[in-house]
């Protein structure tokens, strides 16, 4: 009886196993029409940036055809977690049989399954290097002196190159309390916190206290400023903050969130993407 129970349990577990897959579409039926008015595909800054740099605006810049997505949403057995205009696909999680059937649709080019990564993140002890450098600087960086001088950024700061006019997109696991921490008061008061989005929860609240704080820490190395106490490496830059990482689970879908955030950053005309994340 015990063996029968274990067998039934195993079969049931397999039947309801959640598979990860990319569903690629055949085309973008609205591409020609969309490219007739390319300025509508980007922010004004992004469009002007592409023109200035001679960047080609093409099929990749056109969003995924919405009727294709709506058709998939109407079906059962899986959930759409992310989409990508650059790859013309959606990322789905669900029952394998339900996902495999999609390949028979006229507007689906192919389906690619991914092996789910189950390893959870491990805590690594933080070792702070307090090496003292001989270079003398005029600014009072206080606790950030070592990191600024290690990168030799004091020379840029002395030329007033502190990020002014630049837009940086930070993609990470969360930015709790950036809207209230005193260290980011300068960022907020100068209207340099341009906004953001939590792609993992489909939420505008990228600074929720329930999110992992790694993004807040990363942002602080660049944007935080307290006179005579702390100076980030680019305190006068403007920032978009995007949540793409789920620290508790570490599954492939996070890479799809990352692509979505990169596409959003490109459409907003950011100058730099900072992503202190790694995937294997």
Enumerate the language-model features and the residues they cover.
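Bacterial Sec-dependent N-terminal signal peptides
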Residues: 1-23
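Extracellular pro-sequences of secreted precursors
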Residues: 18-49, 87, 105
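Active-site-proximal beta-strand/loop segments in catalytic clefts of secreted hydrolases
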Residues: 23-27, 83, 94-95, 114, ...
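Solvent-exposed loop/turn segments at secondary-structure junctions
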Residues: 29-31, 87-88, 97-98, 117-119, ...
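Subtilisin-like serine protease catalytic core
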Residues: 35, 154-254, 268-271
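Aromatic- and Gly/Pro-rich amphipathic surface segment
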Residues: 37-75
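Autoinhibitory propeptides
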Residues: 67-148, 154-157
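Short acidic, glycine-rich surface-loop motifs adjacent to enzyme active sites
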Residues: 262-280
């Amino acid at each position: 009886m015990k063996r029968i129970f274990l067998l039934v349990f195993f079969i049931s577990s397999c039947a309801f196993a959640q598979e990860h897959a990319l569903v690629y579409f055949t085309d973008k039926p609205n591409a020609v029409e969309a490219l007739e008015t390319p300025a509508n595909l980007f922010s004004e800054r992004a469009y002007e940036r592409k023109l200035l740099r001679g960047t080609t605006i093409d099929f990749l810049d056109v969003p995924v055809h919405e009727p294709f997505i709506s058709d998939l949403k109407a079906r059962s057995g899986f959930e759409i977690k992310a989409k990508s205009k650059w790859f013309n696909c959606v990322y789905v999680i669900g029952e394998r049989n339900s996902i495999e059937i999609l390949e028979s649709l006229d507007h689906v080019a192919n389906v690619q399954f991914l092996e789910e990564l189950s390893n959870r993140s491990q805590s690594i002890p933080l070792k702070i290097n307090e090496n003292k450098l001989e270079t003398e600087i005029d600014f009072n960086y206080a606790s950030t002196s070592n990191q600024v001088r290690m990168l030799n950024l004091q020379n840029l700061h002395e030329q007033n190159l502190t990020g002014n006019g630049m837009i940086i997109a930070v993609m990470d696991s969360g930015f709790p309390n950036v809207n209230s921490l005193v260290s980011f008061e300068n960022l907020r008061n100068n209207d340099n916190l341009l906004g953001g989005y939590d792609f993992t929860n489909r939420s505008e609240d990228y600074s929720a206290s329930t999110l992992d704080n790694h993004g807040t820490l990363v942002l602080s190395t660049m944007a935080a400023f307290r006179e005579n106490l702390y100076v980030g490496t680019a305190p006068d830059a403007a920032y978009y903050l995007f949540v793409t990482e789920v620290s508790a689970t570490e599954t492939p879908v996070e890479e799809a969130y990352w692509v979505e955030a990169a596409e959003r950053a490109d459409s907003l005309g950011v100058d730099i993407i900072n992503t202190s994340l790694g995937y294997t």
